[in-house]
Amino acid sequence: GAMWKTINFDGAAAAVNTYLNTGKIKNLTFQDTKLKEDAFINKADSLFAANNEGLNAANLPTAFTDKEKIRLKYFTYGFFPMHPMYYVYQTKDSTHVASNTFYNKLQSLITIDSKLLTLPEYKEFLPNAIASMSNQGVTEKPENTTEQFVNYIDKNIKDKKVAEYLVNLFVYGNISSRGLDGSDALISMFNKHVKDAKMLDKFNTLCTKWEKLKAGTPSPAFSYPDINGKTISLADLKGKYIYIDVWATWCGPC
């Protein structure tokens, strides 16, 4: 259980480690997203104020405190960008639309600085924040939300390293799950913003894999036993109507 609470630290970093191990730092949770917008914002601000108060009371070295204040912001407000989506999910209120007050608050939390990409909390917060900000003023959900996110980045993010991180994250994730069909605009944006050799290599490997599954590409030949043990090959199916039933391994056929 709570054995970690009884640990005592020694040495030059004892005070810092004791602070980090107190467990008193609190953040927004998924459950908080069912709060109405104003109450949600107030709770987020209250948590952040309490976290800062605890940090200041610890009276730690300035260099650590300055970095920790930044980390605390993104740790505390981690769930903040998702409120519009999660509120609808939790309350079933499909009429909810985030207000300008919400977007103004979210915008105030966003700092675009590639030096912050060393912070896991920042790297997790930022994509969600950008995705949420790109929804401001959008009345109809686009066919591909990733294009909306990437276009927002292209227009608004001037820090090249931050733009690269975000575009790579969104485009790679989209093609990983949806393939190459209809992805020309995304690939164009990827090539515009992503220059890192490792990112490019990983992306090209992904595209090569999906190239085989593009619409119009001949299927690879195969031979598999049917439910009666008879071997069926792709060639045997030529000229026939094929019904494909896709189902999960843990359930019976639909």
Predicted regions and their residues:
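Short amphipathic alpha-helix with an adjacent loop that forms part of the alpha/beta core around
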Residues: S233-L237
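Oxidative protein folding and maturation machinery
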Residues: A2-N228, I232
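Conserved redox-active cysteine motifs that mediate thiol-disulfide chemistry
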Residues: K238-G239, D245-C254
